[in-house]
Amino acid sequence: MGIFSIANQHIRFAVKLATAIVLALFVGFHFQLETPRWAVLTAAIVAAGPAFAAGGEPYSGAIRYRGFLRIIGTFIGCIAGLVIIIAMIRAPLLMILVCCIWAGFCTWISSLVRIENSYAWGLAGYTALIIVITIQPEPLLTPQFAVERCSEIVIGIVCAIMADLLFSPRSIKQEVDRELESLLVAQYQLMQLCIKHGDGEVVDKAWGDLVRRTTALQGMRSNLNMESSRWARANRRLKAINTLSLTLITQSCETYLIQNTRPELITDTFREFFDTPVETAQDVHKQLKRLRRVIAWTGERETPVTIYSWVAAATRYQLLKRGVISNTKINATEEEILQGEPEVKVESAERHHAMVNFWRTTLSCILGTLFWLWTGWTSGSGAMVMIAVVTSLAMRLPNPRMVAIDFIYGTLAALPLGLLYFLVIIPNTQQSMLLLCISLAVLGFFLGIEVQKRRLGSMGALASTINIIVLDNPMTFHFSQFLDSALGQIVGCVLAFTVILLVRDKSRDRTGRVLLNQFVSAAVSAMTTNVARRKENHLPALYQQLFLLMNKFPGDLPKFRLALTMIIAHQRLRDAPIPVNEDLSAFHRQMRRTADHVISARSDDKRRRYFGQLLEELKIYQEKLRIWQAPPQVTEPVHRLTGMLHKYQHALTDS
């Protein structure tokens, strides 16, 4: 595909974006808003943001959800701005500095919450800063400005949603149905690989791909949930399917690991059975029916526990899959599956990374303030706003540097594009609302196509161009003001990029170590006789951490294997029949405290000391299990866990 080519699948969204911009423009001028530009800018960003993230037309519900987050973020930012102004109106410099800290605080929170919701916090940070900077000449107009800004943004969001509904957005339901079928086949093929016990790298690639696909399916579930309330039943089933899919991966990989030491556990009956190739979900269905008969014939005791658990999870997966595809009423059997264990939420491992983001945003905003006060430049405030926007939005993404470069390219492209609109197009269309709408629709159409291609600078160019062309009521054409605004955007982006380069983020290794120690803590916490604790479902949280580890350290197989081994140990110990008595219960609490100390230790020396203490406690615990005559289902997993911790002691403790 050529650089300027237009693919058929890109046209519908481009028309949708153009319609959203035109609607916002028309409504803004019709209701005599003072700055319709904010409504147009909001409509463009809300519609184009999900398309840029998806690399194509976003699925149904994505634009609505982003609009909802933008409303929340705007209201939080407006309230924070009003509070800061009321409290510090007599100290303008202090007021701006507090706003810089507020922007950093919001970036810190956005780095810790779910990526889907982080947009609202990033927006809240720079909205307060925009209000404080804008009202500097007339602080008494703060409430009026806040209300007007909220109104304009709500109008822009409503226009984006109307355009989305007008052009029948894509439903993700068919994609979900296809992925459910394909994922079941892939799960069966992984079990075949694990029973064959072939090349370890092939198995690693297979389970790694399945972890990514299961995570992607969870993202599809979120999209389906946003799409319509009629998918509520399918959403409940998909949530349970997520846990079942992770269970299937865990049981398959444990089957592979067991054969490293005890290959005789997997009998020839099962090896021959899993030799049969499968291509479709129907093939898997037939094989599972035969497999259940084989287990009924051989007996549960003669069946390896991993295969027995895998078949049970696959059968439940099949049952819920049919329910998702048909979206029928949930029956009693499904309800029993859905009433599963409560999911556990883990503490974020990226606290140091979040603190780096806090300092990046705060320092860049303070640098912008100093630049503005030192130069006295009329567009210093515009540069400061761009600094806050770039840092607030870039920090929550995996590669902030590339986001800043995207904004720089976008603001550079916006200068000649905005110049064309400011000097030629808008003055010649000022007397005709129709011509003005057509001119902006053309801009939205072509940039909408580039946004879907994820062209570097396209998103920044769309927002920056709309921001600098005259869309105020009434329109005034001052070239010096236009040039100041355009240059202010460029300078702000360059300053933000400079701060991102200077304040290095070296938290990657620390995050990896914290994640691995959280896996260890989870495995240790599974050693308990508390019934409520044993019923907690840690699996989704553990695999979410594993997915983060895979993204932070792509290709680092030893780390992935260690994490997966800890997950397997957690699942095996969770189901182990540990003897119930006060002596063991007290020791379980002691080991959990020590594991928590390992995670929270701030220095390598403390971490090594606590880790050594944990290893000593595990040694004592094994002796206690022998005294209390614990069965092999308990002693063997504990022995394997202790061996793994001894083997990887340095990787888990050293920076």
Swiss-Prot record:
Organism: Escherichia coli O6:K15:H31 (strain 536 / UPEC)
Record's subcellular location: Cell inner membrane
TM annotation in the entry: 13-33, 38-58, 69-89, 93-113, 121-141, 152-172, 370-390, 407-427, 431-451, 459-479, 482-502
Record-given protein name: p-hydroxybenzoic acid efflux pump subunit AaeB
Protein purpose: Forms an efflux pump with AaeA. Could function as a metabolic relief valve, allowing to eliminate certain compounds when they accumulate to high levels in the cell.
One Pfam family recorded for the sequence: FUSC
Record keywords, A-Z: Cell inner membrane, Cell membrane, Membrane, Transmembrane, Transmembrane helix, Transport
GO molecular function: transmembrane transporter activity
Highest taxon of source: Bacteria
One record GO biological process: carboxylic acid transport
Bilayer topology annotation: Multi-pass membrane protein
CC annotations in GO: plasma membrane
Keyword Disulfide bond belongs to the record: no
Induction: Positively coregulated with aaeA and aaeX by AaeR.
UniProt family annotation: Belongs to the aromatic acid exporter ArAE (TC 2.A.85) family.
